[in-house]
């Protein structure tokens, strides 16, 4: 993901949007949710939603249990609560592509279910690259799977390939 944003410079790379080569992508084209939090502790939840141009009513419609924290500073939220706001702030604004790195980390199962519904809604309008260790959830919302190993990715044509390549057990 760092290569896509021009923060890491490999000897060779090929970045394309709909077949058109690009040296790097702009923030208006691609949004990225890093593994670690990015919102400063002193900002309030409602300010973050406003700064990202998001409709607070829509957010709290998806996550009604967080409405009571609307005016809370980010530093007082749990890791999972922070992740919910950051996930929504990156996924939902208009753009062409979204990169989500370990987006389900620290998030309670109820909110992961909501994330999956939001991913289904948003993937109609943009490309989404989702990396996460929660195989079942990733598989449920993915149109295609391309596991990474040793710096390369391979498209999965059949679920049995994931077992053969050692990504999942037969029981999964």
Write out the residue ranges for each language-model feature:
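Hydrophobic anchor residue at the start of the ABC signature
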Residues: 86-87
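Conserved ABC transporter NBD signature motif
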Residues: 10-26
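Conserved ABC ATPase signature
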Residues: 73-77, 81
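Helix-to-loop junction immediately C-terminal to a conserved catalytic motif
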Residues: 5
